[in-house]
């Protein structure tokens, strides 16, 4: 049965309510103390676990304590320091390039708009939304693999394209819940709605999910 917008919105509100009860302490799992550190951490997290990234960050931020330090780092040395995170050569170029752009174009401060953020080397909508929501308090949703999979299973999204999903979800969920929703869905995807072995019988959303395995 095709749901109308009122029914979809009501189901979305209930999903948020149940997830908040299940994951009251959900938050960004990357460790950072300022917007630039989160930018670096998010670049490193591509195709890498947050746990592995967090293992690398303390020594990395000790070696490069500022935007300027990253901007003028020795690229080969930086690449080796982030080697455990994978794709180290490309990530090093992105980190240095974005840091240099922040120095040259933004006075050493991470910009606070989507338009300016996605102009930085290595920064896409996912990283930009993470920074906007976490550091600057703007309503935003990070569309990662968990969000793509679970929102399609819940039939709140009908695409695999992150930007299209982001726009679809903005129409469904209350703006006040966007940032928190991302973290709760990620936690749910790691703990219960696991890609290859979803534990539907343990899922708090099983009565609301059209894709539940009975």
Summary of predicted features, one role per range:
Residues 2-214:
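Catalytic cores of DNA base-excision repair glycosylases
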